[in-house]
């Protein structure tokens, strides 16, 4: 019997096989190739090592960055919020004590951990990657088995470079066809989550497959894998191919010379075998997919942008009906309202889902030469200092500034509102982030998850919009990048 991609990577990392079978099976012990850390989930883990008198076992496989609490304005000044400042200072002290490489605020490689890892070439096919962060699944776009872990597991990896886990089930997400202009990777994953639900992937590793996935860039594949957790999955993966290798080659930590050739030879084996069997398969037609947007308070509460706000009566399940009623109340929406009639106050372009260079390029293409709706505030927050510098070298910052957007420094920013970038109560935001939970972007804030394409068009019109809703002269020179 053949193996899936996830099974191949798993089996290659088993240090000790758990005893027993089926429901009585004990966890396997897996070796971890890359451990990424940040300021929020690492302090207790470092303290655990300190109290036990243990060293950090593999400093060479551990890298830290500051992202969740970092300000995106005035980064040369002391952090005003005491909690945020304490977490940043604690990370710096811990990394210095234990010898961990840290990219601090102001460093040219600082940024969101799930942007920094890939851009440095640290994330590679066939790896096991962990981080104390839900959206570690981002790295699965490279054919890595990448998952978020809790603080106690962070300490375990620090101490042993291993993790005890039971094997997951496997689910294939088959996306065939060709995306239409203005439809992106973000729309694919929002449609997948709407289809299987926020718990549909629980206990599974998702493998994204099919012609539509193969046609995507690495930035776009990272967008899809990033939100696997929003479907309840532990991880999401895409098999590596030439697109992967073209992205990786020449990056600081990528193999070189003969090592590169040997690595690619191995990476080419990391595909699901023809005779492998998935536990579940889900199909999505890319040809018919439209821009997607959420209307409620979880990522599964989404519809096509051309649709209307659903009614609780549209849901047969009583729990889903009750959830819809609560979501509509919190979001201040009425059933039957066209999604395109919903006016927003803020547009946020950023987060580990959509803050890479292609995301910024496609948004800039749409707004170039246009005027922002005067009642809309737009924040553009690059995912890393490197992305920011690259965007500035291309003149994208000037496009955003001329449009009236705020051009910020790198960080998680308004995705989760742990720094000053927050919504006011009742404020409505079109956001390229990954979660639209109640209060996620600020107490009482209302979040609609969208693609960078929809975010840009929305900033122009002031209501949830796609580029096709703009006047021909306002559509910009779309690059065709599927982000």
From Swiss-Prot:
GO terms for biological process: L-leucine biosynthetic process. Keywords: 4Fe-4S, Amino-acid biosynthesis, Branched-chain amino acid biosynthesis, Iron, Iron-sulfur, Leucine biosynthesis, Lyase, Metal-binding. It catalyses: (2R,3S)-3-isopropylmalate = (2S)-2-isopropylmalate. InterPro entries: 3-IsopropMal_deHydase_lsu, Acnase/IPM_dHydase_lsu_aba_1/3, Acoase/IPM_deHydtase_lsu_aba, Aconitase_4Fe-4S_BS, Aconitase_4Fe-4S_dom, IPM_dehydratase_rel_enz, IPMI_cat. SUPFAM superfamilies: Aconitase iron-sulfur domain. Coiled coil: none annotated. GO terms for molecular function: 3-isopropylmalate dehydratase activity; 4 iron, 4 sulfur cluster binding; metal ion binding. Its cofactor is [4Fe-4S] cluster. Pathway: Amino-acid biosynthesis; L-leucine biosynthesis; L-leucine from 3-methyl-2-oxobutanoate: step 2/4. Pfam families: Aconitase. Signal peptide: none annotated. [4Fe-4S] cluster binds at residues 352, 412, 415. Its EC number is 4.2.1.33. Binds 1 [4Fe-4S] cluster per subunit. It is an enzyme of class 4 (lyase). Belongs to the aconitase/IPM isomerase family. LeuC type 1 subfamily. Catalyzes the isomerization between 2-isopropylmalate and 3-isopropylmalate, via the formation of 2-isopropylmaleate. Heterodimer of LeuC and LeuD. This is 3-isopropylmalate dehydratase large subunit. It comes from Paenarthrobacter aurescens (strain TC1).
